[in-house]
Amino acid sequence: MVPFLVLAQQCAPTVAPQTMAAIVQVESGFNPYAIGVVGGRLVRQPVSLDEAITTAQSLEAKGWNFSLGIAQVNRYNLPKYGSTYAQAFDPCKNLKMGSKILEDCYRRAIVKMPGQEQGALRAAFSCYYAGNFTGGFKTKPGSPSYVQKVVASADVTTKPIAVVPMIRKTPDAAAAVAAPVKKRQPADRNSVLVDLHPSSQSMPATGAANAPVRLKTEQPATTDAPPGKDNTDGVVVF
């Protein structure tokens, strides 16, 4: 396990670690396998890399638009960064992509708001969420705006992120080598279930941990607009 702020410094060096932490808190709750579906949500989130990849592939095959990973990078942004689904679920690679998107938003915002660092940063949060400098400031009755949620998470207590551990040098005789044990595969790992009437949430919703991940037969909602973030249904996308 690696402290998030350490990981952010290494993988997203162009964004202040606590700023990245606030976005990640709102986007995924520090879940590297999170998937947010536009127009719906998963009944439960994937619990492993294999399940997350399979879920993403199934959603793509059915025509759904979604964001994925710890910083919730939209699927349509992956080709721009040469990323596969497997790489997008890697916390470091996902943070790197997310930070590049936020950095681009901030650079454009500060040009429009010279000398207003914090104002430009908030505009960048809106851009990260909605693809523009205004959508992230919109509120709904009883719910704060996306920008307000991120700002409120500025002092969030970060969670450690699981990574491949550092090797420890030990005498050969003391380093026991065991054959890998074949793990039992998650039930119905080849499909996902999408709830077409999700409740309003600020991050991908999680259901019962033991519920199978399936895909309903209903067709996804279509949109004429370019991919953009919409966090009103527990989905955050670019």
UniProtKB/Swiss-Prot annotation:
Induction: Specifically induced within macrophages by phagosome acidification. Induced at 37 degrees Celsius in minimal medium, suggesting that nutritional stress is a regulating signal.
InterPro entries xref list: Lysozyme-like_dom_sf, Transglycosylase_SLT_dom_1
Described function: The VirB system could be required for the establishment of the replication niche in the host.
Pfam families according to UniProt: SLT
Residues in coiled coil: none
Superkingdom classification of source: Bacteria
Lineage, highest ranks first: Bacteria, Pseudomonadati, Pseudomonadota, Alphaproteobacteria, Hyphomicrobiales
Protein name: Type IV secretion system protein virB1
CDD domains with a match to the protein in the record: LT_VirB1-like
Sequence similarity: Belongs to the virb1 family.
Residues spanning the signal sequence: none
This protein's record includes keyword Amino-acid biosynthesis: no
Extra facts: Transcription of the operon is maximal in early exponential phase.
Keywords for this protein: Virulence
Keyword Repressor listed: no
Species annotation: Brucella suis biovar 1 (strain 1330)
Region: Disordered, residue numbers: 197-238
